[in-house]
Protein backbone atom coordinates (compact mmCIF):
# COMPACT_ATOMS: atom_id res chain seq x y z
CA UNK A 1 0.00 0.00 0.00
CA UNK A 2 1.53 3.36 -1.01
CA UNK A 3 2.32 5.72 1.81
CA UNK A 4 1.54 9.40 1.79
CA UNK A 5 3.72 12.29 2.87
CA UNK A 6 2.19 12.42 6.35
CA UNK A 7 3.02 8.76 7.05
CA UNK A 8 6.60 9.23 5.81
CA UNK A 9 7.14 12.25 8.06
CA UNK A 10 5.63 10.48 11.08
CA UNK A 11 7.81 7.39 10.48
CA UNK A 12 10.97 9.50 10.20
CA UNK A 13 10.04 11.31 13.43
CA UNK A 14 9.53 7.98 15.25
CA UNK A 15 12.92 6.76 14.04
CA UNK A 16 14.52 10.06 15.07
CA UNK A 17 12.98 9.86 18.55
CA UNK A 18 14.21 6.30 19.08
CA UNK A 19 17.72 7.28 17.96
CA UNK A 20 17.72 10.30 20.29
CA UNK A 21 16.91 8.10 23.31
CA UNK A 22 20.39 6.58 23.14
CA UNK A 23 22.31 9.63 21.87
CA UNK A 24 23.49 12.53 24.01
CA UNK A 25 25.89 15.38 23.29
CA UNK A 26 28.15 17.16 25.77
CA UNK A 27 30.34 20.23 25.43
CA UNK A 28 33.38 17.93 24.99
CA UNK A 29 31.68 15.65 22.43
CA UNK A 30 28.59 17.43 21.06
CA UNK A 31 25.88 15.90 18.89
CA UNK A 32 26.09 16.70 15.17
CA UNK A 33 22.41 17.08 14.29
CA UNK A 34 21.32 16.99 10.63
CA UNK A 35 18.12 18.36 9.12
CA UNK A 36 17.42 17.84 5.43
CA UNK A 37 14.77 19.76 3.51
CA UNK A 38 13.94 19.38 -0.17
CA UNK A 39 16.28 22.22 -1.12
CA UNK A 40 18.77 22.70 1.73
CA UNK A 41 20.64 20.79 4.42
CA UNK A 42 21.39 22.10 7.90
CA UNK A 43 23.88 20.80 10.46
CA UNK A 44 24.61 21.95 13.98
CA UNK A 45 26.72 20.87 16.92
CA UNK A 46 24.49 20.71 19.99
CA UNK A 47 25.45 20.51 23.67
CA UNK A 48 22.47 18.64 25.15
CA UNK A 49 23.58 19.22 28.74
CA UNK A 50 23.32 23.01 28.35
CA UNK A 51 20.63 22.81 25.69
CA UNK A 52 22.23 25.14 23.16
CA UNK A 53 23.93 25.09 19.78
CA UNK A 54 27.72 25.46 19.74
CA UNK A 55 28.11 26.05 16.00
CA UNK A 56 26.16 25.45 12.80
CA UNK A 57 26.38 25.45 9.01
CA UNK A 58 23.95 25.08 6.13
CA UNK A 59 23.67 25.40 2.37
CA UNK A 60 22.34 28.93 2.96
CA UNK A 61 25.91 30.09 3.80
CA UNK A 62 27.75 32.07 1.13
CA UNK A 63 30.95 29.99 1.38
CA UNK A 64 29.21 26.73 0.43
CA UNK A 65 30.13 25.62 -3.07
CA UNK A 66 29.02 22.78 -5.29
CA UNK A 67 27.11 22.09 -8.45
CA UNK A 68 24.95 19.30 -7.07
CA UNK A 69 23.15 19.04 -3.71
CA UNK A 70 25.53 16.21 -2.70
CA UNK A 71 28.59 18.37 -3.38
CA UNK A 72 27.00 21.23 -1.42
CA UNK A 73 26.35 18.86 1.50
CA UNK A 74 30.01 17.80 1.54
CA UNK A 75 30.97 21.48 1.55
CA UNK A 76 28.62 22.10 4.51
CA UNK A 77 30.31 19.26 6.41
CA UNK A 78 33.74 20.73 5.75
CA UNK A 79 32.54 24.21 6.80
CA UNK A 80 31.07 22.81 10.01
CA UNK A 81 34.33 20.98 10.80
CA UNK A 82 36.25 24.22 10.26
CA UNK A 83 33.92 26.14 12.59
CA UNK A 84 34.12 23.32 15.16
CA UNK A 85 37.91 23.46 15.08
CA UNK A 86 37.75 27.23 15.72
CA UNK A 87 35.49 26.48 18.72
CA UNK A 88 37.95 23.87 20.03
CA UNK A 89 35.84 20.82 19.17
CA UNK A 90 37.46 17.80 17.53
CA UNK A 91 34.97 14.97 18.30
CA UNK A 92 31.21 14.67 17.81
CA UNK A 93 28.39 12.12 17.89
CA UNK A 94 26.62 11.88 14.51
CA UNK A 95 22.82 12.19 14.69
CA UNK A 96 21.42 11.44 11.24
CA UNK A 97 18.00 12.69 12.31
CA UNK A 98 16.07 9.62 11.20
CA UNK A 99 17.27 9.97 7.60
CA UNK A 100 18.96 7.08 5.82
CA UNK A 101 22.76 7.27 5.79
CA UNK A 102 23.04 7.86 2.06
CA UNK A 103 23.21 10.69 -0.42
CA UNK A 104 23.33 14.18 1.11
CA UNK A 105 23.45 12.94 4.73
CA UNK A 106 26.41 10.69 4.00
CA UNK A 107 28.18 13.44 2.03
CA UNK A 108 27.81 15.82 4.97
CA UNK A 109 29.30 13.26 7.37
CA UNK A 110 32.20 12.52 5.01
CA UNK A 111 32.84 16.24 4.54
CA UNK A 112 32.96 16.73 8.31
CA UNK A 113 35.42 13.83 8.62
CA UNK A 114 37.56 15.23 5.80
CA UNK A 115 37.54 18.58 7.59
CA UNK A 116 39.05 16.97 10.69
CA UNK A 117 36.00 16.28 12.85
CA UNK A 118 36.06 12.80 14.39
CA UNK A 119 32.61 11.17 14.30
UniProtKB/Swiss-Prot annotation:
A single BP term in Gene Ontology: translation
GO cellular component terms, semicolon-separated: cytosolic large ribosomal subunit
UniProt keyword annotations, A-Z: Ribonucleoprotein, Ribosomal protein, RNA-binding, rRNA-binding
Domain of life: Bacteria
Chain intervals for the UniProt region annotation (Disordered): 54-76
Gene3D superfamilies in UniProt: 3.30.420.100
UniProt entry tagged with the keyword Ribonucleoprotein: yes
GO MF annotations, alphabetized: 5S rRNA binding; structural constituent of ribosome
Keyword set includes Electron transport: no
A Pfam family this chain is assigned to: Ribosomal_L18p
HAMAP family: Ribosomal_uL18_B
Similarity-based family: Belongs to the universal ribosomal protein uL18 family.
Known role: This is one of the proteins that bind and probably mediate the attachment of the 5S RNA into the large ribosomal subunit, where it forms part of the central protuberance.
Subunit: Part of the 50S ribosomal subunit; part of the 5S rRNA/L5/L18/L25 subcomplex. Contacts the 5S and 23S rRNAs.
PANTHER family hit by this protein: 39S RIBOSOMAL PROTEIN L18, MITOCHONDRIAL, LARGE RIBOSOMAL SUBUNIT PROTEIN UL18M
The protein, known as: Large ribosomal subunit protein uL18
Amino acid sequence: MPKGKKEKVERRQRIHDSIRESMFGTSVRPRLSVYRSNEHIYAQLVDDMEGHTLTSASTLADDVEGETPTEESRSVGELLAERAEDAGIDKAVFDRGGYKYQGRVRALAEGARDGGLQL
